[in-house]
Amino acid sequence: MSSLHIFSDVLALSIAAFSALCVQAHLTKRFTPTFSKNLEEKLPQHNKAVFWWLGISDNALRYVFVSLNILVSVSLALADLRTTGLKVSMGLLFIGFYSDMKLGESPIPHLILCSVVGAAIVAR
């Protein structure tokens, strides 16, 4: 295993851990109160800006995000699915970036995560 592959695995596992943290933040405020509050406040805006065509409630969208974050965490944690998980992560981050741009919010968090995922993909 090359050092680039190990580097990619470390980045992928870091993204998996962050995705698991996002699941926790969507479900409870106990460990990440500020992050949870931010997600809770921004979710309705993102629902109206990007996901209006789904016609689902904010609460349902929250569980869609939780499910997607679980999918990403599991796929990045499993070595056989890691490449696919990175590609799915990149696609979801592009949607988040688009949503930020549409709402006039700072795209920096999604750009940083896109850079990390992109580096992991290139290093594979």
UniProtKB/Swiss-Prot annotation:
E.C. numbers: 5.-.-.-
Entry's Gene Ontology molecular function annotations: isomerase activity
The organism's place on the tree of life at top rank: Eukaryota
Transmembrane found in the keyword field: yes
Bilayer topology: Multi-pass membrane protein
Biochemical pathway: Mycotoxin biosynthesis
Keyword list, A-Z: Isomerase, Membrane, Signal, Transmembrane, Transmembrane helix, Virulence
Protein name as it appears in the record: Probbale cyclic ether formation enzyme scpZ
Species whose genome carries this gene: Mollisia scopiformis
